[in-house]
A protein has these predicted regions:
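Solvent-exposed strand-loop boundary residues in beta-sheet-rich modules
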Residues: 56, 101-103, 116-118
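Surface-exposed, charged secondary-structure patches
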Residues: 64-109, 124
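N-terminal secretory signal peptides that target proteins for export/translocation
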Residues: 1-2
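A short, surface-exposed beta-strand/turn
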Residues: 108-119
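Short, well-ordered alpha-helical segments enriched in acidic and aromatic residues
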Residues: 33, 41-58
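Short, low-complexity N-terminal intrinsically disordered segments enriched in polar/charged residues
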Residues: 5-12, 16-39
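Extracytoplasmic/periplasmic, Sec-exported soluble proteins
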Residues: 25-29, 38-41, 59, 104, ...
């Protein structure tokens, strides 16, 4: 009986560690989404890019991929300098993203939406 209690206690501790290890804030997961998107963009991995985009206007994956390829050819690699002013309200979020490409920097507000448990950049 004591081995069973010990085993259950160890399972409970292990489960608590797993849950405790997933302590990213909503703001951090928004930032990770944006940084992962640009990592895929720089690698020209369009499938991963498309996985980070919400196409609520139903533009279509082929059209978005075509636009991404043209943009990548024009910008070259993009460096994400910062992700700031992350504001999460329910299943929507915005973040100010400062990027540098071709020696130029710009900061834009990115709208995001949470779908199926993951943040997606809203395609506009």
């Amino acid at each position: 009986m004591s081995r069973r209690i010990l085993a259950l206690a160890l399972i409970a501790v292990f489960a608590a560690l797993l849950v405790g290890g997933c302590s990213d804030t909503k703001e951090e997961t928004v930032e990770y989404t944006i940084r992962d998107y640009y990592s895929a963009y720089n690698a020209e991995d369009w499938d991963i890019c498309l996985g980070h985009i919400d196409d609520t206007d139903n533009v279509g994956a082929a059209t978005i991929e075509s636009v991404l390829k043209m943009a990548r050819a024009a910008t070259g690699e993009v460096i994400v300098e910062s992700v700031t002013n992350v504001n999460v309200t329910g299943s929507t979020a915005t973040a100010d993203v400062k990027i540098t490409f071709g020696g130029q920097s710009e900061t834009k507000e990115y709208p995001l939406v949470k779908k199926d448990g993951s943040w997606k950049i809203s395609w506009q």
